[in-house]
Design a protein with these regions (language model features):
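Bacterial N-terminal signal peptides
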Residues: 6-16
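Histidine-centered divalent metal-coordination motifs
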Residues: 65, 69-76, 80-81, 198
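Sec/Tat signal peptide C-region and signal peptidase I cleavage site
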Residues: 17-21
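Binuclear metal-ion centers of metallo-dependent hydrolases, dominated by the metallo-beta-lactamase
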Residues: 99, 189-251
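Core dinuclear metal-dependent hydrolase active-site scaffold
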Residues: 22-65, 73, 86-161, 165, ...
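Proline-aspartate-enriched helix->loop->beta-strand connector
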Residues: 63, 164-168, 179-199
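Positively charged n-region of N-terminal signal peptides that target proteins for export
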Residues: 1-4
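Extracytoplasmic/secreted cell-surface and envelope-processing proteins
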Residues: 76-77, 150-153, 174-180, 202-209
Length: 251
């Protein structure tokens, strides 16, 4: 009941309007797996889901904020991030409930939306997951963590708001949504830019990990752009008119 109440009530709180600042460029740096560093025009740095020892090199990253969608070792290596960042752990101790975040850093807002890591409302061992949203410089950016829900509720959609840039897992499970479910979530959220994450690469260890690479998700999709870089610089006036999938290289 506690979960149900928070899922219904808090979404309304999270949709408080945010005054957009001047439309200036935001930099999104992809470190690999589900790990991103978002840097605002004012220099606020938000590290999202830093990975542990899964084969990717450990980069030098400094941040002001670290977000952790859930407490699995490939998403919660906060010690990798240098500086003295604020750490937003999406799940409470024991991972049986969500933590709630809605905090401003200058003109940047970072907030959380409760979700599930599975398709049975958190009752499997996979449990809970948190979506993190960054609102800055006229952009709304969402990181779905290890979402396992095949569809979002109306309350979750309201909490997310109109998403411009969406990071979504596309590795076909087994710990996240399937490829058809990922495609359905994109259609439901309707972002301007989709950045695939959490898919198999030659760097990902162990090599027997059962997921797939990004190509099955891209099959049959229109407006796919392979960036050829680990850094995307984007501003609101550069957003495409229809949804574009941007495949980034990991650093």
């Amino acid at each position: 009941m506690k979960r149900a109440i928070w899922l219904v009530v808090s979404f309304a709180l999270l949709t408080t309007p945010v005054a957009w600042a001047q439309e200036r460029p935001v930099t999104i740096r992809y470190l690999g797996w589900s790990f991103f560093l978002v840097t605002t025009a004012d220099g606020v740095r938000i590290a999202m889901d830093p990975y542990g020892n899964i084969g990717y090199p450990f980069p030098t990253v400094e941040a002001d904020v670290v977000t952790v969608s859930h407490e699995h070792g490939d998403h919660n290596n906060v010690g990798l991030v240098k500086g003295s960042p604020r750490v937003f752990r999406g799940l409470a101790t024991g991972a049986a409930d969500w933590n709630r975040f809605y905090e401003r850093f200058g003109s940047t807002l970072v907030y959380s939306v409760a979700a599930f890591h599975d398709d049975v409302q958190g009752t499997s061992p996979r449990g809970l997951n948190v979506l993190f949203v960054i609102v800055t410089d006229g952009l709304r950016i969402a990181h779905l963590g290890d979402i396992g829900q095949p569809a979002l509720t109306d309350g979750q959609l309201r909490a997310l708001g109109t998403i411009d840039v969406l990071m979504i897992p596309v590795g076909d499970g087994p710990f996240t949504v399937t490829i058809p479910q990922a495609s359905a979530l994109v259609a439901q959220i309707r972002p301007k830019v989709v950045i695939p994450m959490h898919y198999k690469t030659p760097t990902r260890q162990p090599p027997t990990w059962p997921g797939v690479d990004e190509r099955p998700f891209l099959e049959g999709k229109q407006n796919v752009r392979r960036l050829g870089s680990h850094t995307l610089t984007i501003s609101r006036d550069q957003l495409p008119s229809t949804t574009q999938i941007v495949v980034m290289e990991h650093q």
